[in-house]
Amino acid sequence: MRFTPLFLLAAVAIASPAPDLNARHELTRRQASESCPIGYCTQNGGTTGGAAGDTVTVTNLADLTEAAESDGPLTIIVSGSISGSAKIRVASDKTIFGESGSSITGIGFYIRRVSNVIMRNLKISKVDADNGDAIGIDASSNVWVDHCDLSGDLSGGKDDLDGLVDISHGAEWITVSNTYFHDHWKGSLIGHSDNNEDEDLGHLHVTYANNYWYNVYSRTPLIRFATVHIINNYWDSLIDTGVNCRMDAQVLIQSSAFHNCPDRAIFFADSDYTGYAVVDDVDLGGSSNSVPEGTLTPSSLPYAAITALGSGQVASVIPGTAGQKL
């Protein structure tokens, strides 16, 4: 039997998806096993998540909850769309990684009094306030949030939903990188109360690197007591306010830009004491910085330098790289 060239091409086209799919699965597993390479989560022995354990794939809320709350190291790959109304209490030594195109709706992740957790390539939306934050990090250490797409719903009341990434109660060695915060009332909070100095002061070391903030009302982020490095962030079309530095926080903001934002890009409000900021190569886009100069400088950071894109480049780069892009 003779096969025409057209038939052979068709056969190749039909056969090719399987190798491509296998390659995609292999890439997902490799990315899900990666350790945090950037910012404060490289400290204190580093952040490896579930790399020392097995890998499982989950497609529903029950299996996701069971895996995330289990003892021992485990990498959890989220496949497809999972929705519900729940707060998942993530245990230590976990990586939760979203496959390309996966999504989680209405489910919050509570990382409380644990260590060594990675939340990566997840698309999380519309978490009701009863289920906490999209990602809440409370009294925990070594947490990496990377390449996540986090959003809410501005059509409801301001308190119907809580924060997208909130970090509190002396949490330590946290990096939030390559993440897309959008369409929400409350972006990200560090330090939950002006009255929590005894627990928070000297802790709350957080890096925000390469993040995109779009159409967020406030808390981008709000910072109390903490030591925070913000680099290569792009804020676009904020609704009310930008970076709120309060209660003796020390903040370093580098290589970042604001566009189409209200006047208060970097500011202090609503506490008895101001925070402080060193602002280096930041395009305020016509907005203002009213925070006193601080003492946190690049040379005082304990981790490897993060390459600065430059304030003139973040607008063209960060929206294309932040979010569920792995």
From Swiss-Prot:
GO biological process assignments: cell wall organization; pectin catabolic process
Summary of the function given for this chain in its UniProt record: Pectinolytic enzyme consist of four classes of enzymes: pectin lyase, polygalacturonase, pectin methylesterase and rhamnogalacturonase. Among pectinolytic enzymes, pectin lyase is the most important in depolymerization of pectin, since it cleaves internal glycosidic bonds of highly methylated pectins.
UniProt pathway: Glycan metabolism; pectin degradation; 2-dehydro-3-deoxy-D-gluconate from pectin: step 2/5
Entry note: cofactor: Binds 1 Ca(2+) ion per subunit.
The protein's name: Pectate lyase plyB
Effect of pH on activity: Optimum pH is 8.5.
Pfam families: Pectate_lyase_4
Keywords, alphabetical: Calcium, Carbohydrate metabolism, Cell wall biogenesis/degradation, Lyase, Metal-binding, Polysaccharide degradation, Secreted, Signal
Active site, UniProt feature: R219
Enzyme class per UniProt: lyase
Cofactor(s) required, per the database record: Ca(2+)
EC number: 4.2.2.2
Keyword Cell wall biogenesis/degradation found: yes
Thermal response of activity: Optimum temperature is 37 degrees Celsius.
Signal sequence interval, chain numbering: 1-15
Family the entry assigns: Belongs to the polysaccharide lyase 1 family.
Residues binding Ca(2+): D133, D162, D166
InterPro entries: Pec_lyase (IPR002022), Pectin_lyas_fold (IPR012334), Pectin_lyase_fold/virulence (IPR011050), PEL (IPR045032)
